[in-house]
A protein has these predicted regions:
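Juxtamembrane intracellular "pre-TM" segments in multi-pass secondary transporters
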Residues: 1-8, 189-219
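Cytoplasmic helix-loop-helix junction between adjacent transmembrane helices
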Residues: 104-142
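C-terminal membrane-cytosol helix-exit motif in multi-pass small-molecule transporters
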Residues: 151, 155-157, 175-196
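Helix-to-loop junctions at the C-terminal end of transmembrane segments
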Residues: 60-73, 159, 262-276
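C-terminal ends and interior cores of transmembrane alpha-helices
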Residues: 82-97, 286-298
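C-terminal transmembrane helical hairpin of 12-TM major facilitator-type secondary transporters
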Residues: 271-320
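Pair of pore-lining "gating" transmembrane helices in MFS-fold secondary transporters
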Residues: 4-37, 108, 210-230, 308
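Hydrophobic core of transmembrane alpha-helices in multi-pass small-molecule transporters
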Residues: 19, 100-115, 302-317
Length: 322
């Protein structure tokens, strides 16, 4: 019988790391489009900085896995957090210098960092028994609830931290949070099998890819994550365009991320009782149910804006985009 003491310790460490490292995503999402609109040479490129975060996650996921396989979880996560520090500093420099290119480079690097953060929940299962794995994932995901508050509140409280350089302090704070993450992940303990028990190399990647379950999981991830990103990327910029404050836009992202991680208190036990396939299907049904209502509301809002303008940049009065 597997002793879950190390797994429980690592789960607590990873939940704290999720709270700190996970704050990077709502920070960039809250401000990326707004800053992009101010710095970009073309209005159509306004949301590129946020899109580059998602690209960084996609590009960094497999390399992060290879790094951790070679260096171990603790060293790999320290390296990932260093990317987070670099991303925050480069983004801050881009904002301070008014450089759209530098800001985009910073958000891309932040995406590489988030690729490591997103694997925290899976690392929690390394030394866990079969019965504890689902709950370990849920506990780490609960750290995302704290991240949902830390990220947007960092935006609100640090956006004017550097006099005369709006939002520069926010990305410096993002770098500081990544530094704190390094301190936290340093407390990770190696899983028992790492002490000397030989391990097989696992199945070849092509064998895994050709499994029907893999295709279903990828399809579900593409649909759910794609629609979530579609909403999050443009929402803060749209709110500011409709007359809301930057703080309100950050709070909008806060509630969105709380909605993402709030069910973590229940999903572990739901998966144990009903199975991961049924829980995934229920999530997709919720997305499908929410979609038509959101499309109708946004279409009315954008149509009203088009009717009020002749192609120029017009900022509607507060509440007119509803």
């Amino acid at each position: 019988m597997i002793d879950d003491r190390i797994a429980r310790h690592n789960t607590r460490v990873l939940a704290a790391a999720q709270a700190l490292g996970g704050a990077a995503s709502p920070i960039v999402t809250s401000l990326g489009g707004i800053i992009g609109l101010a710095l970009s040479p073309d209005r159509g490129l306004a949301t590129l900085p946020v899109s580059l975060v998602q690209l960084g996650v996609a590009l960094g996921t497999l390399p992060a896995a290879f790094v951790m396989r070679r260096l171990g979880r603790r060293n790999g996560y320290i390296l990932g957090a260093l990317l987070g520090v670099a991303g925050g500093l480069v983004a801050a420099a881009g904002v301070a210098r008014g450089s759209f290119l530098a800001f985009c480079l910073g958000t891309l690097t932040t995406g590489l960092y988030i690729a490591y953060v997103q694997s925290y929940r899976f690392a929690a299962t390394d030394a866990a028994s079969v019965g504890f794995r689902a709950r370990a994932i849920s506990w780490v995901m609960c750290g995302g609830l704290a991240a949902a508050i830390i990220g947007p509140q960092t935006v609100i409280w640090t956006r004017e931290l550097v006099p005369g350089l709006m939002f520069t302090g926010t990305f410096l704070a993002q770098a500081a949070l990544a530094l704190l993450t390094i301190v936290v992940v340093a407390f990770l303990r190696p899983a028992p099998f790492a002490a000397g028990a030989p391990r097989s190399g696992g199945r070849p990647l092509l064998v895994i890819v050709w499994q029907p379950g893999f295709a279903i999981a990828v399809a579900a991830g593409i649909v759910s994550f794609g629609l979530m990103s579609f909403l999050m990327t443009a929402a803060p910029d749209a709110m500011v365009e409709c007359g809301h404050s930057v703080g309100s836009a950050a709070l909008g992202i806060q509630w969105h991320v709380l909605g993402m991680f709030g069910p973590s208190f229940l999903t572990g036990r739901l998966i144990e009782r009903y199975g991961k396939e049924r829980v995934t299907a229920a999530g997709l049904v919720l997305i499908a149910a929410a979609g038509p209502r959101r499309v109708r509301r946004e279409w009315r809002g954008f149509k009203e804006r088009d009717d009020r303008s002749s192609g120029g940049r017009v900022r509607p009065a507060p509440g007119k985009c509803r």
